A protein has these predicted regions:
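N-terminal beta-rich core of secreted/periplasmic extracellular enzymes
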Residues: 1-89
Length: 89
């Protein structure tokens, strides 16, 4: 088992409880979805909602988008994510 209180995590008891509860509540499909990232330029809320609800993406990567578009897309992705989405630029 991973020691979540040790380096590099340094989580407290409340954070560890959140991790354990979240993982326990996830379906196998949701866990597999966390392995996948999307390089997306779409900014449609309907499209992004569908990505999160159908594929349970673990992250999103950006490539040359205007800052306001990135912020808007992040807001939408996080809104529909069960687990916070990892964002990379």
């Amino acid at each position: 088992m991973v020691n979540l209180k040790a380096k590099p995590y340094f989580l407290n008891d409340a954070d560890i409880a959140w991790v354990e509860t979240t993982i326990a509540s996830m379906t196998p499909e949701e866990k597999v979805g966390q392995l996948f990232w999307q390089l997306t330029a779409g900014n449609s809320e309907e499209y992004l909602k569908e990505l999160m609800e159908n594929y349970h993406l673990g992250g999103c990567r950006y490539n040359g988008m205007p800052g306001q578009m990135v912020l808007n897309q992040n807001r939408i992705l996080q809104k529909y994510a069960k687990v916070p989405v990892f964002i990379a630029c």
